[in-house]
């Protein structure tokens, strides 16, 4: 495995991790893992990237605060519901259609566009996650899979085409709405854990675009 393919694997893992955080409430077991040496080492290593340092440290700060709550898992689950599962007036709804389509309705053109990406690359949406295709967790899971598929390409031309597809996907399907999604999450997530997650997501996407564009 060369340095670039190893780096791609790390990128995929980060996107899958962020997808998992934004797909459902953390269980008690998952929350306990965030206090483990392995996870804290992962976060510390991520924070060593200067462009990510502030965002990662903000998340670590919120994780530390979570551990001090009396009913940590229940309260964080309530935060998840408040942040993402309310109405568009009270929550930061995690669907691209809510930000990119003038109708303001779910399953609009951005969801159709996402279904086309899934079909083009023969990547299946997880059957147990019954959400519109433009849910943030589905888009991030797709991106992780696209990165892994990139590493599987045999020719240099195919590899470069898949790297280019990643750049297009991030710009068109993610950075077109996640900054606003993060702003609303900051406004409506009073405790701030999920606002820290979406803040890190946007920061990482912007850094990843620079990497993919060769800047």
UniProtKB/Swiss-Prot annotation:
One of its GO terms (biological process) is protein complex oligomerization. Disulfide bonds: none annotated. Keywords: Chaperone, Cytoplasm. It comes from the Bacteria. It is found in: Cytoplasm. One of its GO terms (cellular component) is cytoplasm. Belongs to the TorD/DmsD family. TorD subfamily. NCBIfam families: PRK04976.1. HAMAP family: TorD. Involved in the biogenesis of TorA. Acts on TorA before the insertion of the molybdenum cofactor and, as a result, probably favors a conformation of the apoenzyme that is competent for acquiring the cofactor. This is Chaperone protein TorD. It comes from Aliivibrio fischeri (strain ATCC 700601 / ES114). The gene is torD.
């Amino acid at each position: 495995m060369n340095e670039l393919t190893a780096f791609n694997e790390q990128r995929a893992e980060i996107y899958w991790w962020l997808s998992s955080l934004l797909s459902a409430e953390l269980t008690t077991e998952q929350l306990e893992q965030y206090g483990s040496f392995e996870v804290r080492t992962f976060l510390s290593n991520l924070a060593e990237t200067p462009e990510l340092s502030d965002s990662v440290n903000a998340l670590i700060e919120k994780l530390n605060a979570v551990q001090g709550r009396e009913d940590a898992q229940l309260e964080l689950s309530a935060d998840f519901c408040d942040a993402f599962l309310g109405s568009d007036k009270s929550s930061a709804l995690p669907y691209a259609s809510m930000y990119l389509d003038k109708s303001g309705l779910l399953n609009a053109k951005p969801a159709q566009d996402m279904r086309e990406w899934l079909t083009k690359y023969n990547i299946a949406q997880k059957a147990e996650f019954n959400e519109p295709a433009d849910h943030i967790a589905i888009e991030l899971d797709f991106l992780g899979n696209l990165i892994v598929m990139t590493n599987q390409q045999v020719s240099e031309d195919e590899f470069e085409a898949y790297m280019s597809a990643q750049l297009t996907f991030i710009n068109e399907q993610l950075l077109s709405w996640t900054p606003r999604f993060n702003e609303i999450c900051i406004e409506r997530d009073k405790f701030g854990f999920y606002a820290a997650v979406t803040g890190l997501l946007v920061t990482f996407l912007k850094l990843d675009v620079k990497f993919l564009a060769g800047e």
